[in-house]
Amino acid sequence: MARTRNRFDRTPFQTAITDLSHDGRGVARRDGEGGKVTFISGALPGELVRAEPTARSRHFDEAKTVEVLEASPQRVAPRCPHFGVCAGCVLQHLEESQQIVAKQRVLMDNLERIGHVTPQAVLPALSGDNWGYRRKGRFSVRRVEKKAKTLVGFRELDPRFVADLSVCYTVIPQIGENIPLLAALVEGMDGKRDIPQIEFIAGDDAVALTIRHMQPLSARDQQAWIAFAQEHGFAIFLQPGGVDSVHPLWPQEVPLSFRLPQWDVDLAFRPLDFIQVNASLNQKMIVHALALLDAKPDDRVLDLFCGLGNFTLPLARVVREVVGVEGDAGLVARAKDNAQRNGLDNAQFYAADLTQDQRNAAWMRQGFDKLLLDPPRSGALEVLQQLPLKTFERIVYVSCHPGSLARDAGYLVNEQGFTLVSAGAMDMFPHTAHVESIAVFERR
């Protein structure tokens, strides 16, 4: 939808906040604007604020809080000095216990409004570490000529700009406390203008940085990164092109993996692989999902969008057989290796694009008792429409987007005869508006 940012009245106005939007902004309806909705960053339900308009569109306006006139009792002082500028977090001003309450509300609203379904029971919200939890992410890097400095950080709320971060409390401390050193290192490079991003990922025993560079690094620049890695305990990878171009700079062998001790499983991964960002929540989520699936020793389970085997390999410790299917062939190769490394011969893996026709695939024709799926933000409707759903006793759906979960839940309940037994939010990304959730369906 087209938005106007320049030619409108930016005079601050006073308004009451009635709700919290799905992206963490306060919601107001302005009487002088005919009840038109305005989304206001930095505002909480129950507050009276002065806000400055930032954008207008036909159906809603946008604004930012400039003064809180009457504060919510749930408002707290943000821990981060960059809150309100950096887009990495949008909820630090809301009491931690209330953040997950808000996410539960977003989930239930989506299920009812989009899917036209209501769970028989609301699952207790699941939480893990709230600070220093983020073990995977991507920083933007930008040389600002006017300031004669390099910025390393997440995007600002205005995504045209990179936040100038001195610290980040949501990423693991080894990363969050060293952002200024990263910026200074890039600023001192010969190729300082050729680094658009730095990715980080942490295993249990190593933390890796992947440096995206548009031109070959000079020998001097490479040595600077090696010295930084040796001093601060990082592994450095270089990425001159696409994903396949990633290779180690120092050291040459990097043991990237994380353990799931409850199932005696160790999962190895590569620097750009997908892993769940919150290690403590991930372990709780796996316990939760397997319990909700009611996995039994004689079960055959299908695990769709299985990735490295995050759910598949723990399931293999519990059930007779599990089949994991994933669209990324590299992840499938790592999942197979992980099964072998962990001595699991009852886990099979297939590479398949689950947005395309898979009705003749070998794995599709096998019989299964239960289904677990953890799709991307786009959801799983395409593959759900192909599966022999009536053969599954129970489905556990792990979701990273409540809208696509709600759509798919509507299909399962209203068109395929399943019951939505329960659903609940999981706080994978505390202090952000991201809603992770889990839902359980049973065949009627």
Swiss-Prot record:
Binding-site positions, S-adenosyl-L-methionine: Q276, F305, N310, E326, D353, D374
Active site: C400 (nucleophile)
Keywords, alphabetical: 4Fe-4S, Iron, Iron-sulfur, Metal-binding, Methyltransferase, rRNA processing, S-adenosyl-L-methionine, Transferase
rRNA processing keyword on record: yes
Enzyme Commission number(s): 2.1.1.190
GO biological process: rRNA base methylation
Annotated binding of [4Fe-4S] cluster, by residue: C80, C86, C89, C168
Molecular functions per Gene Ontology: 4 iron, 4 sulfur cluster binding; iron ion binding; RNA binding; rRNA (uridine-C5-)-methyltransferase activity
Major enzyme class: transferase
Catalytic function, reaction form: uridine(1939) in 23S rRNA + S-adenosyl-L-methionine = 5-methyluridine(1939) in 23S rRNA + S-adenosyl-L-homocysteine + H(+)
Stored PROSITE patterns: SAM_MT_RNA_M5U, TRAM, TRMA_1, TRMA_2
Occurrences of domain TRAM (ranges): 5-67
Lipoprotein listed as a keyword: no
InterPro entries linked to this entry: 23S_rRNA_MeTrfase_RlmD, MeTrfase_TrmA_AS, MeTrfase_TrmA_CS, NA-bd_OB-fold, SAM-dependent_MTases_sf, TRAM_dom, U5_MeTrfase_fam
Entry-linked HAMAP family: 23SrRNA_methyltr_RlmD
Role: Catalyzes the formation of 5-methyl-uridine at position 1939 (m5U1939) in 23S rRNA.
Protein family per UniProt: Belongs to the class I-like SAM-binding methyltransferase superfamily. RNA M5U methyltransferase family. RlmD subfamily.
Name of the protein this chain belongs to: 23S rRNA (uracil(1939)-C(5))-methyltransferase RlmD
Lineage: Bacteria, Pseudomonadati, Pseudomonadota, Gammaproteobacteria, Lysobacterales
Gene name in the database record: rlmD
